[in-house]
Amino acid sequence: MTRIKSAVAAGGRRAPHSARLGSASTRTIGAVLAALLMTHDAGAAEPIIGQASVIDGDTIEIAGERVQLNSVDAPEEWQVCLDERGADYRCGKESASALDAFLSASRPTRCEFAGRDRYGRFVGTCFRADGKDVNRWLIESGNAVDRDTDNKGLYASAQQTAKSNGAGIWRAQPEHACAARVGRVNRKPSC
């Protein structure tokens, strides 16, 4: 106690006890937070496996977690497309129904983590129990398009197959879901 008083009396300043501990405490807290963040990221990278419920043509839910199918853009549920005769059909509803039937044929579904989208949803590539790539199938069957801005054309060959076969939305000239969303909600395109 005398030394502290004499240091202050001599014009020196000594940090309070709490401040001296603060730097060690701050380092400890920082290390704990860093460990938690690394654990969280490692946990987020784990695949999700379970029975999938179809939300729409490019979104499913497994065990309460919404999964946006990576590099897939399907028509919105409300979206109407033109068929080969120029007649309207509910392509968004058709896409979601086709996805549900495809997933139901081989359960459970496993989704590999690719990241999170701007809404915080799990973004992944999903596979049926028999190993078939759900994302690729959606595009190859013409029920969705390759969002090539995300994957540098990973599914370009699948999309070309769908176009060549006139499958799904490729029966006529489709309006891409992204463009339809922009027109409906009056926002900037994300594609």
Curated annotation (Swiss-Prot):
Cross-referenced CDD domains: SNc
GO terms (BP aspect): polysaccharide biosynthetic process
Keywords recorded for this protein, A-Z: Exopolysaccharide synthesis, Plasmid
Disordered: annotated span: 1-21
InterPro entries: SNase_OB-fold_sf, Staphylococal_nuclease_OB-fold
Pathway in which this enzyme or protein is active: Glycan metabolism; exopolysaccharide biosynthesis
PROSITE patterns: TNASE_3
Protein name per the record: Succinoglycan biosynthesis protein ExoI
